[in-house]
């Protein structure tokens, strides 16, 4: 809080009716400082001068100037004349006061403010000139368009049909190319499938040939075994024939021996019946030969059946193995075809994935750039808003200060009007009463308490001295 003390002193001298002069001087000392826009401080002072005279009329003038570090100034002038009538005026302007007052700005700051005012005026003049030039150009453009008028439009309808035909041909060619590409891809896949089938069939053929070669070796072994068995059968037959022949020879020999013997009858114990013995021996040999034949036939048939069973079992196993191998090869072929199709699908999906990733990467980069630009614009807008808010607060502060100063000056002017009227009436009464020279001095002291740019309290003291 700061306290402002204003002191007004006035002196009056009166003479005769022929002429006279009255002087009122007012001095103000104010200690007030307020923060400026750039963090500094500004101060102001008020100086005023009133000159009045009596003669054919009474006139007075008042002028004051206010300047400050806020970048603006206030000036006012007041004048009154007595004769034809009484009138008053009040004016204000930025940049400094005019009249008989002393400015509160230093010489350098006054020149700076004047330069700024000149530059502002020149800028406004340029703006007006550019607006006028823009208006002239718009008028000229409208006139030119009016003079030119709408030209005759060409009829492009015949070309539209040609364009549609060409578009349809292009679309048909595109579809045909796509079909050809699809057929080429299908032919390539079919060729790959046929190549795979050929390789599979070739491998199957080689394996079948290998199996046939193995079966041929088995057949050769079986043929050799059969030949061996046939040779054994022949040997057994020869042995049987040889045994039969020996048996017949022995029988014939025994018969010859029996036929050539002399029969001698003796009265003795009965002898051995050789015929019976030979018959028994024949039966024994025949039974032995028959047994050997049956055994050989049984062994041959058993071996043959065993070999036939082995051949049948091996043939069944071979056939089942061939069937299983064929099914396995078909399964392998179908699995290879599925593998090729899956690999083709995988390659196509990988290509699509790469394209999609590239496309979305590009879109993401564009969105990121857009987000960055929007964030930059938002930051700039935020900075502009903060700057404008700061400027608004500063201007609002300046406006409040100027309104306070204007109110103060208005009170001062109202007080000066009252003083001038009282002095005029006292001068007229003094002139009518006596011609002696009377000097009076009136001291007016105003004490104001200002807190945060607002007047909290105001006190006024007046002192009058006459001599």
From Swiss-Prot:
Residues 255-277 are annotated as: Linker 12. GO terms for molecular function: structural molecule activity. GO terms for biological process: epithelial cell differentiation; intermediate filament bundle assembly; intermediate filament organization. PROSITE patterns: IF_ROD_1 (PS00226), IF_ROD_2 (PS51842). InterPro entries: IF_conserved, IF_rod_dom, Keratin_I. Keywords: Coiled coil, Cytoplasm, Intermediate filament, Keratin, Nucleus. The keyword Nucleus applies. Residues 145-162 are annotated as: Linker 1. Residues 1-20 are annotated as: Disordered. Residues 109-144 are annotated as: Coil 1A. Expressed in epidermis. It is found in: Cytoplasm; Nucleus. Residues 278-416 are annotated as: Coil 2. Its main location: cytoplasm. Residues 1-108 are annotated as: Head. Residues 163-254 are annotated as: Coil 1B. There are two types of cytoskeletal and microfibrillar keratin: I (acidic; 40-55 kDa) and II (neutral to basic; 56-70 kDa). The nonhelical tail domain is involved in promoting KRT5-KRT14 filaments to self-organize into large bundles and enhances the mechanical properties involved in resilience of keratin intermediate filaments in vitro. Belongs to the intermediate filament family. Heterotetramer of two type I and two type II keratins. This is Keratin, type I cytoskeletal 14. The gene is KRT14.
């Amino acid at each position: 809080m700061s306290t402002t003390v204003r002191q007004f002193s006035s002196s009056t001298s009166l003479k005769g009716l022929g002429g006279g002069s009255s002087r009122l001087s007012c001095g103000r000392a104010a200690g007030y400082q307020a923060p400026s826009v750039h963090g500094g401080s500004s101060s102001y002072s008020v100086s005023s001068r009133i000159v009045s005279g009596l003669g054919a009329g009474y006139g007075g003038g008042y002028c004051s100037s206010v300047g400050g570090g806020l970048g603006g100034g206030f000036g006012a002038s007041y004048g009154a004349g007595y004769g034809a009538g009484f009138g008053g005026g009040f004016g204000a302007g930025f940049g400094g006061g005019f009249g008989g007052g002393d400015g509160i700005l230093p010489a350098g700051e006054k020149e700076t403010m004047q330069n700024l005012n000149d530059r502002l005026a020149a800028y406004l003049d340029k703006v007006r000139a550019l607006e006028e030039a823009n208006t002239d150009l718009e008028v000229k453009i409208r006139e030119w368009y009016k003079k030119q008028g709408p030209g005759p439009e060409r009829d492009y309808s015949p070309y539209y049909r040609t364009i549609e035909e060409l578009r349809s041909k292009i679309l048909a060619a595109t579809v045909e190319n796509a079909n050809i590409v699809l057929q080429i891809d299908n032919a390539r896949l079919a060729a790959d499938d046929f190549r795979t089938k050929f390789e599979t069939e070739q491998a199957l053929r080689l394996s079948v040939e290998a199996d046939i070669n193995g079966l041929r070796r088995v057949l050769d072994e079986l043929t050799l075994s059969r030949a061996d068995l046939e040779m054994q059968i022949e040997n057994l037959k020869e042995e049987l024939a040889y045994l039969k022949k020996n048996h017949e020879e022995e029988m014939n020999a025994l018969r010859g021996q029996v036929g050539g013997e002399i029969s001698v009858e003796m009265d003795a114990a009965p002898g051995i019946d050789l015929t019976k013995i030979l018959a028994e021996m024949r039966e024994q040999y025949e039974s032995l030969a028959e047994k050997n034949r049956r055994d050989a036939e049984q062994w041959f048939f058993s071996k043959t059946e065993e070999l036939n069973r082995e051949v049948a079992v091996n043939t069944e196993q071979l056939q089942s193995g061939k069937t299983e191998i064929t099914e396995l090869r078909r399964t392998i072929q179908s699995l290879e075809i599925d593998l090729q199709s899956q690999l083709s699908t995988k390659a196509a999906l990988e290509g699509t994935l790469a394209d999609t990733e590239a496309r979305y990467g590009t879109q993401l980069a564009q969105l990121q750039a857009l987000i960055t630009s929007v964030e930059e614009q938002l930051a700039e807008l935020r900075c502009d808003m903060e700057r404008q808010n700061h400027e608004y607060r500063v201007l609002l502060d300046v406006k409040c200060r100027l309104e306070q100063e204007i109110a103060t000056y208005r009170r001062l002017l109202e007080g000066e009007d009252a003083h001038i009227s009282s002095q005029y009436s006292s001068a007229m009464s003094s002139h009518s009463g006596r011609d002696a020279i009377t000097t009076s001095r009136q001291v007016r002291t105003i004490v104001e308490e200002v807190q945060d740019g607002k007047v909290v309290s105001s006190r006024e003291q007046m002192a009058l001295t006459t001599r």
